[in-house]
Each structure stands twice: as structure tokens, then as C-alpha cells.
Amino acid sequence: MSGPTWLPPKQPEPSRLPQGRSLPRGALGPPTAHGATLQPHPRVNFCPLPPEHCYQPPGVPEDRGPTWVGSHGTPQRLQGLPPDRGIIRPGSLDAEIDSLTSMLADLDGGRSHAPRRPDRQAFEAPPPHAYRGGSLKPSGGAVPTPMLPASHYGGPTPASYATASTPAGPAFPVQVKVAQPVRGCGLPRRGASQASGPLPGPHFPLTGRGEVWGAGYRSHREPGPGVPEGPSGVHIPAGGGRGGGHEPQGPLGQPPEEELERLTKKLVHDMSHPPSGEYFGRCGGCGEDVVGDGAGVVALDRVFHIGCFVCSTCRAQLRGQHFYAVERRAYCESCYVATLEKCSTCSEPILDRILRAMGKAYHPGCFTCVVCHRGLDGIPFTVDATSQIHCIEDFHRKFAPRCSVCGGAIMPEPGQEETVRIVALDRSFHIGCYKCEECGLLLSSEGECQGCYPLDGHILCKACSAWRIQELSATVTTDC
């Protein structure tokens, strides 16, 4: 894109408007087929706008009525102009000014009767219209009213912009008049403010619903520190630079704002009422705050006041004392011991490991044999009819049957669990004691060749039994 070409002044040729179009005061002329020319005013110097600086909104028909720039920099459509006025001449300038002033008053007066919110009133601005190039032709001291971008802070602020593709040309001082609100807008009337400076570069006015009427009539403010300024050669449109400018402002009093306000009040209250000392948490006994150094103790993964950390049974304070925790409850030593099981042998509380047998609790050292007093922890045992505890050996020695020959207890063999004994003539015998009383022959319990042949209460083998029988028979014969 090439920069504008500045031609020397020539004899001005009257430019003509198309049929049915009128040029209001201060508006740009219609486009021409040749390069843009400049007709200097005897009192005011003008800087022409190059054709590439004019913005044509997409989708907007070209045949629109003239526009004027409000105090927000928002283009407003002027209604009611005659369709065919011809070229504006210096002689009709005063009448044109009066007509425009009357139309503006009617528009603003009609707007003031519309229902609005008590705090702010929103309106929709019609889309702007811009001519594509042309010549500036001020007449009769008329001052053009440029289209200024909507400002974030309400006040009109003319600024100079240099696009990246167009070199900055010579600056011509220009008096720029900013349109001010008239009566009927619900705001105090103010005088027109003036500012000197070069004409602004291309801009894109905000025409969305997010613009609020009356927001731009605040006092002139300096830009806040949180609003960045655009770099030279780059124009940031109003509304944060988002496309289209449709960014409606959120209504007041939404839940996030209420939540933020509540949290802020809570923070202010907490800061206004600080604790008197260091805060350690809530007491596990009474639920109150534990504040101050030395005011609490930590136990059972909780914080307690000194007076709240007591025994669950006798309510004695446990600070600096040994305590026992049972199911997240603290006990002093005496109360804890009272809750323990007692040994069935010595009747003392069991503080260490518990050994249970036959439904009773024992100290491991108290669970012993009543005969040999050997500890039976992990060793097989048995009990008698009176529930006395015996080891297996002592139980057999005490309660096993006795051998009729040796008189010893008949017990299981080492490594065996069963007891083997021989019963004959209602007497019990060890296997090794079951012998013939005459010859000492080891008898067998099977009843075969070396079986027992009892005779007159004696245990005899077969031979000895026969000899005894013959001897008795001879004696009987002799007696006869």
C-alpha cells in the first residue's frame, strides 16, 4: 500500500455529489475518479485522509444517510434529512447548522423518554458509514467532525496514529470539535471541549450492544495503570480489541461477586479481630480454639486444652503423665490397669501378652504344669477332672494304669501318642512284663503257641501250665 501523494494547490473544481445525496457540515466529500486533492481553508489547515484509511463495514450498504460523531466517538445516524439537497453552499451554512441542531435535539429528546434502568441506559448504535476517499471542502468556517473511537474512560481523546504501511506526512494543525450531549439525555449540559492535534488515523468504532449511554459523560480521567497503551502504528479498538465489539457488560450482583464480597468481609473481620496469641487449632475435648503458647497439648493426633486432656474415667489431668490410649480415649495408668483382664492363676492384671486357654486368660509365665511346674507356652497339655493343667508326661504318670508286675504306669512309647497295654485276669501289664510266672517266658497277646495259660490266678505258659496240672492231679490221687 503506497502513501498519499501531496499535490500542489490548484484551482479547485467543485465536486458534485451523486443524485439524492447531501453532504452535512464537516463530512467528507464523495469519492472521485482521480487522486484526492486538498482545498485549503483561509483560516484552517486540513490534513486529508487517504482512501485506505476509510473503513467500510462488511455487509453495510453504501447508500446511507450522513453520520455524525457523538461524545463517545460512536457514529450516529441522522434521520430526516432531505434526500436531495444538492451541494452545500456557504450561503446556506447557518440554516444547515440550525437544521442539524434541531434534529439532534429531537433525537435526544425522544431517547430521554424511553424507559431505562436507574443506574445506566443502553442503546444500540447503528452501523457507521464512511466514504471511500474524496476531497475535503470546508466552507464558511465549517469544521469537520472526525469519527473518534470509543474511549474506555469516557472522555474524548484525539490521538495520532501512523499505520505500518503509510509513512507519516506533514502534520497540519486542526481544530476538532467534539459533539456534546444536549438536554433531554438525563445528564448535565457541558460546553464543547476543544483539542488541537493531527487527525486520527483509521479506526474501527464500536457498534455493539455493550456500549452504555451515559458512560462516556464522566469527568476526564487519566488512563489507569492497568490499561496498556497500544504501540505506535497499532490501533486498539474500544472494547478490548475483540472482533465485532459485541461484549456486553455483566449485570451487577451475580453469585461470583457476592461470594467475593462475602470472603472479603470475612477476611476483614478476621484481620480486625486477630487472636490474642498463637493459634494451634480446635480442642478435641470442648471444641473451642486453642490459642496461646503453653495453652494446649498434642495427643492422639489432636490438640487439647490443658484442662481438657484428662482421664476418661477419673477425670485426672494427664499433662506430663503416662497415659494409655484405648479406642482414641485416654486413660491414666490406674484406670487403664483396672480395665485389663486378670490372670486366672495369680489374679493379677495382664499388662503384657495374654495367653488364653480353655476360655481363661493367663500370664505366659503362669501357665505351667501343676506337677513339674514347667511352662506350657507352645507345648501340648491336658487337664484332669478338676481342671488342673498337666503336661502329657505328668498326666500319664499320675493317671495312667499301673502294671501288675512292676507297678509302673503304662505310658506311650517315646514319639508315640497311643498307649499299648495287655490286660489279663483283670490286670494290666506292660508288653515287656507279660511273662510266664514259672519260667519267665515272654508271652504273646495273640494266644498262639506262646500264649497265656492262666491257672489258679497265675500267668503261665503252655508247658508250665501242663506240668502244674499233672502235679495237682497226683496230689489228689495220693490223698484218696
Swiss-Prot record:
Modification Phosphotyrosine, positions: Y55
Biased composition (Basic and acidic residues): 108-122
Domain annotation LIM zinc-binding: ranges: 281-339, 341-401, 404-471
Keyword Repeat carried by entry: yes
CC annotations in GO: cytoskeleton; cytosol; focal adhesion; nucleus; plasma membrane
Region (Interaction with MAGI1 and PTPN13): 473-480
Gly residues bias spans: 238-247
Keyword flag Transferase: no
Tissue/organ expression: Highly expressed in kidney, stomach, lung, heart and testis. Low expression levels in brain, colon, thymus, pancreas and skin. Not expressed in skeletal muscle.
Predominant location: cytoplasm
Modified residues (Asymmetric dimethylarginine): R25
PTM annotation, UniProt: Phosphorylation at Tyr-55 by SRC is required for enhancement of lysophosphatidic acid-induced cell migration. Tyr-55 is dephosphorylated by PTPN13.
Modification sites for Omega-N-methylarginine: R25, R111, R183, R190, R209, R242
Annotated localization: Cytoplasm, Cytoskeleton; Cell junction, Focal adhesion; Nucleus; Cytoplasm
Residue stretches of biased makeup (Pro residues): 1-12
Residues modified to Phosphoserine: S92, S193
Family: Belongs to the zyxin/ajuba family.
Free-text domain note: The LIM zinc-binding domains mediate interaction with LPAR2.
Stated role: Relays signals from the cell surface to the nucleus to weaken adherens junction and promote actin cytoskeleton reorganization and cell invasiveness. Involved in lysophosphatidic acid-induced cell adhesion and migration. Acts as a transcriptional coactivator for NF-kappa-B and JUN, and mediates the transrepression of these transcription factors induced by glucocorticoid receptor.
Protein name: Thyroid receptor-interacting protein 6
